[in-house]
Amino acid sequence: MNVERVVDHSAIRTNQVFTITLLALAFVLAAPAISGITGASMLLSAAAPPLGLFTRMYRHLLRPAGIIQPRVVPDNPEPHRFAQLVGGVMVTLGTLLVLAGVTAIGWALVLVVIMLASLNLFAGWCAGCTMYYWFNRLGVPGFSRSRSEAAR
């Protein structure tokens, strides 16, 4: 049985907007608490997408109010979850480095996540998704979905 796999790209874009906004605010205000909460939310979203703070705001507030319309397309969710995991790890590590006094490297990691999320939001290129599909092509265990499966 061939079950179509779909992803709501509006939910992903909403996550990116919240991530970019909160991380930029954390950087400008030099507020590692904000980046820490954002990183934790990203990690939770990667582990259990329905529980992610930004996903919940989209599903229970923004979408029902008609502020954002769903855009459900054939796609694999795993690469997006992997990208969220990579971003969450980088933000969390960056936050811990800032708290440990290694501020330049810590904030640099946060800024990299801002740049990559912006690249995905504005240009449609997901670095974490690309990494996922590379790992799939290399046969790395756990990276079982190929790009062609999303198009079926």
Language model segments and positions:
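Membrane-interfacial helix-loop segments of redox and metal-homeostasis proteins
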Residues: 1-152
